[in-house]
Amino acid sequence: AMIQAVKDGQFDVGMDGITITDERKQQVDFSDPYMVSQQFMLVRADESRFASAADFKADEKLLIGSQAGTTNFYTAVYSVLDGDKQNPRIKLFETFGAAVQALLAGDVDTVLMDASSAKGYIGANPDKLKMLDEALGTEEFGYIFTPGSDLTAPFNAAIKTMQDDGFLNHLNTRWFFLYDANAK
């Protein structure tokens, strides 16, 4: 919905962990990447039936919660399961939050997400969730702009400056990897 809204000019810029892909580049303009992320399996803290994507794939009773059309969905389809987008082992949700709630409730057995998002959910549910160690894919996140936007170049300049002086790495570490949702 966000990509279409920016493409249609409802918004000048969009940013929400949007993965840079060739398909999306046909719809909107992207900034240079501001973050590189990897996909992991978020599971319940007591999960012992599987410890890898291969283990998960082998047990046909296990289900993945995902949001259609996202990088996480395509990672589930192609890196965990059999390449079939209609695979009944993928249960679709409107939001990642809803998929995580289904995971917590036991309705699905894993939700794929980037490490920073997974750590946020784990921080909010420290005794209920964990992340498996196996990285399943790498993606780059970028800001999106209405095609032909004059904002792309200034955003790229700002990203480059923050990369060069280390500030972007500091922000990513501070807010995505050291953040404690339970801190007062």
Predicted regions and their residues:
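Extracytoplasmic small-molecule ligand-binding "clamshell" domains
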Residues: 1-17, 26
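Short helix-initiation/N-cap motifs at beta->coil->alpha
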Residues: 1-4, 49-51, 90-102, 138-139
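Hydrophobic residues within well-ordered alpha-helices
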Residues: 6-7, 56, 103-104, 143, ...
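A ligand-binding cleft/hinge motif common to bilobed small-molecule-binding domains
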Residues: 16-27, 75-79, 104-137
